[in-house]
Amino acid sequence: MRSFSFTKMHGLGNSYIYVDLFRETLPEEELPAIARSVADVHTGIGSDGLILICPSEKAPVKMRIFNSDGSEGKNCGNGLRCVAKYAYEHGIVSDRTFLIETLSGLVEARVAVADGEVTSVTVDMGEPRLERSAIPMLGPEAERVVAEPFAIAGGEYEITAVSMGNPHVIFYVDDIQKAPVTTLGPLVEKDPRFPEGVNVEFVEVVNERELHFRVWERGSGVTQACGTGACAAVVASVLNGKTARGEETVVHLAGGDLTIVWGHDGRVRMTGPAETVCTGVYYYRGGRNG
């Protein structure tokens, strides 16, 4: 049996198993299997996936994320806040503002600290990409997808698509409690019009400063929160005239609230909590199948 030390953390209920690769070593070829194993609620630890906290040549720390199905993701807003908290509290960084490398590029994080503990994290999520080719979604590459008709499973909808370094598609609903997250979500995620798959968000507009939000995440299914998805929802709401550019919007997720602003400088900034759940040692047999 092999083993490694882990920390379980969550951002608004979006939980991952975090492994510090400044101190641990995991075989690259086994990472998808390890992610599937630790995510299993019955035979593993139970989480939405695996996040590696890695050395970087471009920043003080690098984040790699593996979904619960073993696929590697490019970005995760809730994960970034947890990585920032871990890096500061474990001495990987000493400054309260620092860069984190992701597969989507470099991200700036700023931690708020009280009595040595990180209480909240603000992450500069960068500029959204809106052209169809950046999502990616089939169709005219340079066009934006804003309130575009979308037919699926016998229904007619309107969608807005946003890339926050990973793909998102937003559906507006009148009642978030009745949103077809588990029925429409998986169908849209794997729809061939999205060649790399897509995260599917359902949004109810409360007012121009508040949104209710539910998500079906690509590779993970229903989760309590999705930071990049909440950012995409705010961008989509500005594009559709439902919220205001440059103003803070509170997004109510199943796991709690995020405060997000799409600034006039083009950048999206997200503020929210990050929590440590537990630490431990995980035992596994090794091999590509776990």
Swiss-Prot record:
The active site is at C76, C226. It catalyses: (2S,6S)-2,6-diaminopimelate = meso-2,6-diaminopimelate. GO terms for cellular component: cytosol. Keywords: Amino-acid biosynthesis, Cytoplasm, Isomerase, Lysine biosynthesis. One of its GO terms (molecular function) is diaminopimelate epimerase activity. NCBIfam families: DapF. This is Diaminopimelate epimerase.
